């Protein structure tokens, strides 16, 4: 590092600390270019004193200059799908079990939602209440919930990832609870990883087959099935054959309990 700019030496030391000593040459070159650019434009960035601009406040974002905006296809699409279902069905109120906080915080703008989670979230928004519940033993009477969702959740139950107890059939218990509490004529929005082969990636999640999900909810009627593919594509009206072609897709099931 002899002859290097002192600020780059500072960056290099921070990089070594943050990476545990392993640093790619490309990463160092990228940080050096960033630092040189900052030194070049620092005075202009202050805009005549409108902003304070110091090297100790640097926050390098070095991998965001891409041609398209990256996103998590599972979580963008399944929550968008569910919000559209609620916008279409317009229940008087809705109960969600441990799904995405982004989903409940946005959908509660047009449907009152009570959100239950093993690890309750301290959200403070109108039309949204947050409470604690164990999905394998829900605090509701039989057939008492008219509109219910549980998305990208059941695949984790019993795998100890979130502090829950080890239970190889915890997911089965959870799905039985969803069926138990769903009211006659009520709808369940359900999403899990889906593929052609049922697998467990301990302790992250399970992957289900289309037929296994339908079997678990055999007493319910499937109204709609959407799919997020391995390639990140969304199919609004998907088939079992398309689900079987995936390794780690996201199956979005809309079930109804017949009266």
Regions found by a protein language model. Name each.
Residues 92-93, 144, 183:
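Residues that mark the start of a beta-strand
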Residues 149, 154, 158:
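A conserved beta-strand element that flanks and buttresses the S-adenosyl-L-methionine
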């Amino acid at each position: 590092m002899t002859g290097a700019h002192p600020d780059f030496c500072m960056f290099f030391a921070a990089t070594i600390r943050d990476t545990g000593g392993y640093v790619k040459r490309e990463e160092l070159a990228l940080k050096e270019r960033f630092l040189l650019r900052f030194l070049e434009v620092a005075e202009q960035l202050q805009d005549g004193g409108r902003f304070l601009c110091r090297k100790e406040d640097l926050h390098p974002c070095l991998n965001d200059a891409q041609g398209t905006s990256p996103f998590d296809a599972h979580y963008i699409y399944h929550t968008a799908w569910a919000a559209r279902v609620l916008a279409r069905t317009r229940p008087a109120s809705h109960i969600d079990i441990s799904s995405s906080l982004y989903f409940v915080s946005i959908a509660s703008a047009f449907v009152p939602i009570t959100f239950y989670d093993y690890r309750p979230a301290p959200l403070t928004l109108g039309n949204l209440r947050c409470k604690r519940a164990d999905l394998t033993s829900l605090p509701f009477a039989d057939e008492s919930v008219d509109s219910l969702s549980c998305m990208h959740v059941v695949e984790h139950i019993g795998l100890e990832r979130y502090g829950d107890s080890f239970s190889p059939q915890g997911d089965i218990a959870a799905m039985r609870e969803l069926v138990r509490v769903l009211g006659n004529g009520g709808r369940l929005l359900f999403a899990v990883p889906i593929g052609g082969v049922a697998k467990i990636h301990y302790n992250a999640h399970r992957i289900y087959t289309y037929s296994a999900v339908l079997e678990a909810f055999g007493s319910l009627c499937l109204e709609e099935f959407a799919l997020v593919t391995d390639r990140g594509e969304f199919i609004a009206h998907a088939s079992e054959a398309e689900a079987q072609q995936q390794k780690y897709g996201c199956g979005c099931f809309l079930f109804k309990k017949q009266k």
